[in-house]
From Swiss-Prot:
PANTHER family: THYMIDYLATE SYNTHASE, THYMIDYLATE SYNTHASE 1. It comes from the Eukaryota. Pathway: Pyrimidine metabolism; dTTP biosynthesis. One of its GO terms (biological process) is methylation. It is an enzyme of class 2 (transferase). Disulfide bonds: none annotated. Keywords: Methyltransferase, Nucleotide biosynthesis, Transferase. Belongs to the thymidylate synthase family. The active site is at 171 (nucleophile). It catalyses: dUMP + (6R)-5,10-methylene-5,6,7,8-tetrahydrofolate = 7,8-dihydrofolate + dTMP. It comes from Agaricus bisporus. Gene3D superfamilies: Thymidylate synthase/dCMP hydroxymethylase domain. GO terms for cellular component: cytosol; mitochondrion. This is Thymidylate synthase.
Length: 296
């Protein structure tokens, strides 16, 4: 079975057996709680970039680099043509969250801030947080290198104290890394288990699968390991009601082989050294795009 079939089967199951529920956005969802996890092989430089519709690769990579660099200003992405955070960073949305004192685009202490500065006092998206808080991402990298059997290689974006200050609380909120130690002289292998409390199956999950796969490849590259597997456990897995028609089209399509990742240059040793141009995705031949509206 193709790894993408797990995703398609989950959508079918949600559509057939899920509960109709109201939601924060007012759109309405069909929801299933805690479905079986999704497992994607990352071996041989595989990237599980969904093929039953074209996925916005540039947006995925730019957002991931925005996370890993600890940034929280959505305008940085928007200026690069990546508009995925524009709705949540708009002045009207910030005002609806009681955050109208912030300038447009300032999302608050969201993902990247928690990854790189957990526990620091958030001022605004323009402040310098160098050396402040816990740099969880660097700690994960250090542990993978120095203590690979550690059971505490955790990266958490969920900080209850900071949630009221966030434009949107984290959906993909925690991951754990695991180093498989070989019996021979082969490279150690790195796997990632990610938990996502809220999973928009139509728009969000294709992004999240590829993003955490690429993050695992990045961390493997700078730790001298090789990426093995991405496992994703979902909490509230849902289909927005205005995505049903589009997903029915997608479900008719046959998955194609996943692409491979190649690094454009040698010598990347630090997680902050990666640039968009370093990610070369080879062999991506998806079906055409399918338009779906984002609920804000």
């Amino acid at each position: 079975m193709h790894d993408e079939d797990q995703y398609l089967h989950l959508i079918r199951r949600v559509l057939d057996t899920g509960d109709l529920r109201p939601d924060r956005t007012g759109t309405g969802t069909i929801s299933l709680f805690a479905p079986p996890n999704l497992r994607f092989s990352l071996r041989e430089s595989t990237v599980p970039l969904l093929t039953t519709k074209r996925t916005f690769l540039r947006g995925i990579v730019e957002e991931l680099l925005w996370f890993t660099n600890g940034l929280t200003d959505s305008k940085i992405l928007s200026d690069k043509g990546v508009k995925i955070w524009d709705g949540n960073g708009s002045k009207a949305f910030l005002e609806s969250r009681g955050l109208g004192h912030r300038r447009e685009g300032d999302l608050g202490p969201v993902y990247g801030f928690q990854w790189r500065h957990f526990g620091a006092e958030y001022e605004d998206c323009d402040a310098d947080y160098a050396g402040k808080g816990v740099d969880q991402l660097r700690e994960c990298i250090r542990k993978i290198k120095e203590n690979p059997t550690d059971r505490r290689i955790i990266l958490s974006a969920w900080n209850p104290k900071d949630i009221p200050s966030m434009a949107l609380p984290p959906c993909h909120m925690l991951c754990q890394f695991y180093v498989h130690l070989p019996a021979d002289t082969a490279k150690p292998e790195l796997s990632c288990l990610m938990f996502q409390r809220s999973a928009d199956l139509g728009l969000g999950i294709p992004f999240n699968i590829a993003s955490y796969a690429l993050l695992t490849h990045m961390i493997a590259h700078v730790t001298g390991t090789t990426a093995r597997e991405l496992i994703i456990q979902l909490g509230d897995a849902h289909v927005y009601r205005d995505h049903v028609e589009a997903l029915e089209v997608q479900l008719q399509r046959e998955p194609r082989p996943f692409p491979k990742l190649r690094w454009a240059r040698d010598g990347i040793t630090d997680i902050e050294d990666f640039e968009y141009s370093d990610f070369v995705i080879e062999g991506y031949n998806p079906h055409p795009s399918i338009a779906m509206k984002m609920s804000v």
